[in-house]
């Protein structure tokens, strides 16, 4: 974890006396995950979020997102002088089928929303944005100008795959307090959220942690040092606290949650960006979940001074250019797993890879001899 600057002592609790095998979260219910889905909370906080549109997805479109491979609808190319030359035309014999014929209404809604929002949008599903797939984008961010830009990001993202395949991992039904794998998860109404593209300043986005409707702590989201944030810390904390007290504290469905805000210049308005589950799957960023879970509640309704963590200038781990964010998602899973298991695991993987290459070379030589 990067070194942080903390001007106020955290409301820490005593360290646990026995070794824990898992973080002491309360049971995460199916309903809590659904309450953190964009389609659930956005209508209630419509005036607090950037301009966006949620498109209800049909079963054929969800099936398309889940399918292996990336097949994009054809895009009309501008006419050229070569269009009149039919010498080498194959009449489209090798063209892939158009997947959008199975969901034309979704395709048209996406295109019309892009036009309505000035030609640029950023996509997400119920919980996640495809931030891990920006390496597939020509702009190296989640900015999308066409429907195919959106499909490419969604189908290239592990985060989106998790929304589709594992939204209820480690969850329990609302009628039990223990892990019950036999319970049937509820059906999920999937939505594609298209937000009007705004060039966000990542230094001004903050993550805030709420337990029992008390704002415990907050921190910057981008893990780089920003010197200008330090003189602003008290005023930013005050604005976030006021925003929470007036807009979220008594209105969000659950008492425990994590929310993200954005406070652009002139820093007098707080925008709600996302609401996340109070669960280990949510990145605790500059805190550890263990210290958050062991923070003490205020006594007798005494006001709590939430800790606001920022990254210091002299933190060598704070400069993200050394390790690009989501870099692990750009590699095959086998490579990531091998690197996690240490030098031995990577050596074993490289040995297997060399064997595969050698076998392919032998097969290629055999094919050449047969010709």
UniProtKB/Swiss-Prot annotation:
Pfam families: D123. InterPro entries: CDC123. ATP binds at residues 124, 127, 129, 131, 195-196, 205, 207, 221, 260, 274, 276. One of its GO terms (biological process) is eukaryotic translation initiation factor 2 complex assembly. GO terms for molecular function: ATP binding; magnesium ion binding; protein folding chaperone. One of its GO terms (cellular component) is cytoplasm. Mg(2+) binds at residues 274, 276. Disulfide bonds: none annotated. Keywords: ATP-binding, Chaperone, Cytoplasm, Magnesium, Metal-binding, Nucleotide-binding. It is found in: Cytoplasm. Residues 80-99 have a biased composition (Acidic residues). Residues 73-101 are annotated as: Disordered. Belongs to the CDC123 family. ATP-dependent protein-folding chaperone for the eIF2 complex. Binds to the gamma subunit of the eIF2 complex which allows the subunit to assemble with the alpha and beta subunits. This is Translation initiation factor eIF2 assembly protein. It comes from Aspergillus niger (strain ATCC MYA-4892 / CBS 513.88 / FGSC A1513).
């Amino acid at each position: 974890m990067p070194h942080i600057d903390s001007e106020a002592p955290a409301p820490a609790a005593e360290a646990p006396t026995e070794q824990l095998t898992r973080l002491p979260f309360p049971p995460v219910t199916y309903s809590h995950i659904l309450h953190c889905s964009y389609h659930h909370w956005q209508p209630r906080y419509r005036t607090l979020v950037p301009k966006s549109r949620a498109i209800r997805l049909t079963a054929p479109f969800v099936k398309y997102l889940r399918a292996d491979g990336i097949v994009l609808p054809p895009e009309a190319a501008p006419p050229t002088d070569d269009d009149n030359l039919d010498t080498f035309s194959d009449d489209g014999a090798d063209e892939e089928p158009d997947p959008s014929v199975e969901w034309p209404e979704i395709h048209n809604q996406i295109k019309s929303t892009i036009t309505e929002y000035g030609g640029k949008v950023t996509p997400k599903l119920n919980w996640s944005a495809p931030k891990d797939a920006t390496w597939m984008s020509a702009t190296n961010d989640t900015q999308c100008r066409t429907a195919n830009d959106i499909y490419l990001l969604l189908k290239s993202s592990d985060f989106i795959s998790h929304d589709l395949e594992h939204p209820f991992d480690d969850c329990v039904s609302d009628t039990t307090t223990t892990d019950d794998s036999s319970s049937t998860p509820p059906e999920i109404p999937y939505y594609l959220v298209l937000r009007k593209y705004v060039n966000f300043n990542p230094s001004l986005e903050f993550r805030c942690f709420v337990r029992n409707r008390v704002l415990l702590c907050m921190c910057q989201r981008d893990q780089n040092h920003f010197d200008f944030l330090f003189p602003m810390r008290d005023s930013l904390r005050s604005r976030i606290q006021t925003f929470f007290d007036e807009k979220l504290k008594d209105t969000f469905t659950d008492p425990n949650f994590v929310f993200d805000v954005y406070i652009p210049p002139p820093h007098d308005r707080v925008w709600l960006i996302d609401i996340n589950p109070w669960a280990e799957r949510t990145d605790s960023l500059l805190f550890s979940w263990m210290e958050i879970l062991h923070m003490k509640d205020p006594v007798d309704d005494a006001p709590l001074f939430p800790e606001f963590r920022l990254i210091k200038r002299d933190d060598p781990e704070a400069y993200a250019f050394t390790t690009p964010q989501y870099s692990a998602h750009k590699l095959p899973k086998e490579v990531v797993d091998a690197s996690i298991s240490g030098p031995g695991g990577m050596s074993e993987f490289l040995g297997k890879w060399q064997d595969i290459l050698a076998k392919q070379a032998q097969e290629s030589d055999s094919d050449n001899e047969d010709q």
